[in-house]
Amino acid sequence: MPLQKNQVLTLTIERLSNDGSGVAHSPDGEAVFIPGTAPGDVAAIRIVKDCGRYAFGILDAIQTPSPDRIPVDCAVAGPCGGCSLRHLDYAAELRAKGESVTDAFRRIGGLDVPVLPPLPSPEIDRYRNKVQFPVGRDKNGKPCIGFYAGRTHRIVPCPDCKLQPDVLNEIGNTLCDFFAAHNIQPYDEQTSKGLVRHVFLRRGVHSGQIMVCLVCTRAKLPHAEELCRALTAQFSDIATILINVNARNTNVILGSETHTLYGPGFIEDTLCGVPVQLGPLSFYQVNTLAAEQLYGIAAEYAQLTPDDLLLDLYCGMGTIGLSMADHCRELIGVEIVPEAIESAKANAARMGDAIAAKSRFFCADAGKAASQLAAEGLHPDVVMLDPPRKGCDEATLSAVVTMSPRRVVYVSCSPSTAARDAKWLEEHGYRAEKVQPVDLFPRTRHCEVVSCYTKTM
């Protein structure tokens, strides 16, 4: 019998889904997905939509709380939705992430590969080195920063996001005060009027340097010099202030035009000893300390020797490969984004002549480059794969297998696509040795995985 809208059921939450919702079953066996619940909760659930084989519900009341449930310490955690697991004890969060990775490799990959316990993040709050606050107005009409409520473009004001360092929240709030005092208008998506769309902040965890970037509909910002003086006087770690221009009617945050108001236009930091320069368009892991753990695992799995050639596909700014360059004979990196390749070359140069001499970076599609390198007879000893969420296409994996590396190390932000690609590699002569989940995103459902493969044929 179909579930009815607004019907209330008492259900026991069994597990978490991939998006962090609790999963329960109705008396008739229909799966019900309920955000904000924890495995072990017994709760009154109100049905909001029945889709036939499954339904969606909302939490009406907790009747018996899960032993893993903890108090939520953020007033806007519900409507904001950014911290989908903020109500869950961190040990339970790690267990859930480990179970999700294990399930993906067994169900999608068909593999009984050892999945190690997830590596916890060194920090579970205030860990992000980057934030992109949309700018809007609060209920009193004052400019505010916040985040979009789930599946909407309604801004939930959030003056103190628990995932951001205090200083980034403080800078965001100071900017809103400045906008209000000088009648600088937030952009309104409904009317396409206003100036400031986003406040984009970066912080170098090791350097302490901060980048402030205002995403605006035009390059001219009223009182820009006064703003620079006020910000740098109050926040001494601000190294650069920029305006990024995005006048399009789009959901894309950044435009292609950036102007520097103060400083060099970038900040500096290090990641696993690799010196990097970061601007608004730079791709960089948002949890620096956990990323260093992840890179350490990748290096351990690579088992490089001084005679090895390392091929780093989807290399980005080159940080993974360059962090291992001391341990191999030659490094080749491939990335499709031109700015990232220029950054990779500059990062190699900053590491000194010896690293620069053994490192080569090419701007190309990873699959096409891998196919060309395979056709040219390149035989890397180790291949590093760090694809986007969609994973590798078959042409890329086929080219990797043709090059016949001794080992393949696969870094992924999507356990499901990593498991799919693991199955392909297993079917083409590479055995999955082990999988290490690494928690780069505490309080959320996301989890990175590192897996390694050895040649068997």
Where are these regions (language model features)?
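Short, solvent-exposed loop/turn elements at beta->coil junctions and helix N-caps
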Residues: L116-I124, E189, H198, R202, ...
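Carbohydrate-binding surface patches
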Residues: F200-G204, I210-K220
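Rossmann-like S-adenosyl-L-methionine
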Residues: P2-T10, N18, A219-M457
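Short beta-strand micro-motifs enriched in acidic
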Residues: R46-D50, P134-D138, R202-H206, T456
